[in-house]
UniProtKB/Swiss-Prot annotation:
Residues 623-691 form the S1 motif domain. This is Polyribonucleotide nucleotidyltransferase. One of its GO terms (cellular component) is cytosol. It comes from Pseudomonas fluorescens (strain SBW25). GO terms for molecular function: 3'-5'-RNA exonuclease activity; magnesium ion binding; polyribonucleotide nucleotidyltransferase activity; RNA binding. Keywords: Cytoplasm, Magnesium, Metal-binding, Nucleotidyltransferase, RNA-binding, Transferase. It holds the Pfam family PNPase. Its EC number is 2.7.7.8. Belongs to the polyribonucleotide nucleotidyltransferase family. Involved in mRNA degradation. Catalyzes the phosphorolysis of single-stranded polyribonucleotides processively in the 3'- to 5'-direction. PANTHER family: POLYRIBONUCLEOTIDE NUCLEOTIDYLTRANSFERASE (PTHR11252), POLYRIBONUCLEOTIDE NUCLEOTIDYLTRANSFERASE 1, MITOCHONDRIAL (PTHR11252:SF0). It is an enzyme of class 2 (transferase). The lineage of its organism: Bacteria, Pseudomonadati, Pseudomonadota, Gammaproteobacteria, Pseudomonadales. GO terms for biological process: mRNA catabolic process; RNA processing. It comes from the Bacteria.
Amino acid sequence: MNPVIKKFQFGQSTVTLETGRIARQASGAVLVTVDDDVTVLVTVVGAKTADPSKGFFPLSVHYQEKTYAAGKIPGGFFKREGRPSEKETLTSRLIDRPIRPLFPEGFMNEVQVVCTVVSTSKKTDPDIAAMIGTSAALAISGIPFDGPIGAARVAFHESTGYLLNPTYEQQKASSLDMVVAGTSEAVLMVESEAKELTEDQMLGAVLFAHDEFQVVINAVKELAAEAAKPTWTWAPQPEATALLGAIRSEFGAAISDAYTITVKADRYARLGELKDQVVAKLSGEEGQPSSSEVKAAFGEIEYRTVRENIVNGKPRIDGRDTRTVRPLNIEVGVLPKTHGSALFTRGETQALVVATLGTARDAQLLDTLEGEKKDPFMLHYNFPPFSVGECGRMGGAGRREIGHGRLARRSISAMLPAADVFPYTIRVVSEITESNGSSSMASVCGASLALMDAGVPMKAPVAGIAMGLVKEGQKFAILTDILGDEDHLGDMDFKVAGTAKGVTALQMDIKIKGITEEIMEIALGQALEARLNILGQMNQIIGQSRTELSENAPTMIAMKIDTDKIRDVIGKGGATIRAICEETKASIDIEDDGSIKIFGETKEAAEAARQRVLGITAEAEIGKIYVGKVERIVDFGAFVNILPGKDGLVHISMLSDARVEKVTDILKEGQEVEVLVLDVDNRGRIKLSIKDVAAAKASGV
């Protein structure tokens, strides 16, 4: 086919969509160029047949940043790109979330999306270009997909309001970093980080983005009109009406009763028994459905039962109404040898969160397309299988763990002190020890508590809450503090974190169409009510950061020296600073402007290192008495070391009031003596006296 190109204006940028020139064997391939800043190649491939062995839709999204895109060669021994970075993993999830609900229910053909950043000027984030390219590639692929989608990034300034698709430079001054994706009718996904914005400001940003990315959707539709492949002939399996009716009539009441059991393990055990009974009764014989079909139908009845109960105003699975937060149990300082710790329990969800303080050298080094960066704040989230009572894989963090950790990090980071106020590297680890819904928000609460327990001067405590939605026709119910089952069976996952003053993070994933502005507004208001409730209970345990750091944390001393003294502190080949660190057991970081940070395991170690640095950088003061060591004797006097690296001359005439024939009659090398600084000339040479010390002491020097 001949290449097809569509250009359109998107905010302050010109976007070009091109297909038919590159990657022509893929089901759909689009090259997206934003001005001359970013070029992303997006390909989509769909398997022609479904894999019946998989009980889920096998969609995978792979976003990858090639170092050649920024004119770089990868570091390391192998000199090629390795495992996905955290940024690549997070962007892959960002693209996956809005497209997954738009594939038809029951579609089980494998679909793979690959987004490759092939060129960047390092001025803007390529993620929006990748999302636009994904929408376009799916639209022309012929794969069943209820798109297209649009996407946009939004910044916010108090003076200028909302800004569409800011550059990295513009983002620095913004109090909001939000990505929104959706169709022409509805918002499907929101991911954001903010500096205590109000609920109205956050909702305004979502609606602003939705309005602005309509131009993207229209451009993709125009591209598809010219370049789309024929739509696949696919139809869903007909609903097993008779089977569903049989299960509901005989087991519906028992299933409904099972969902009144408030303890998760007991409820699951009872539902497991019922499922076994249904399978035994309705499958296995000739002419009956297969066991997998019966299990799927049983799951559908569960889904409908829970949703009907909720929208009809009945109590939720654990007996709560729609606005109640589960009971909280909060403890801090639970681990004696850590720097800060908290155990946050909300119902059957529990997080053990630990804060650790380190030196500037402990910061995470990030090798990005924009260059190397150091990140002094890390928040890691771990979700072991025992937290849900299962056996499972143990190993490195998966995509979900990386995503949840980043959400918790976004929630907390705006409330951390500036580096010049608190120059420690901070690592927070959230260990999910029990899970029944909203473990990421438990991590936010636990992280805030652990940081305050560690003595990190937080600007304000932070709490998070997960909201849910069940919508049937015109009826809907918004649920506060959702359980795991409510998350799975509901239509929306809506997580809000913030302080008493405003929102610091908002994440939203919507599975259906028709989520109105009114519903989002109600959900944000209900989330605020819950957040303030949780913050009130947290503040009863620890309302502000401890005034002193844990005795287990390293001591940090900040000081500044003249820039011309930096070489003296470092020494030849780093010998001086290395000796100080080895002898005092402290670590020292020196900046080009002369700023020095000294970290010691103990206060004594840090202070010893500080004194050594002061000794090296101090200048000899005229009229001051020093205790020095005789370094070298010559015919005309003796050289005495009074400060590290600083020797002065005691002339033979300055040794004594009496006549001295030989210097060695008075002094010997290695001897400690008191000397008075008489003068320092413009070349830095120091003139000393021994004979004038007594008179100087008498005069009060």
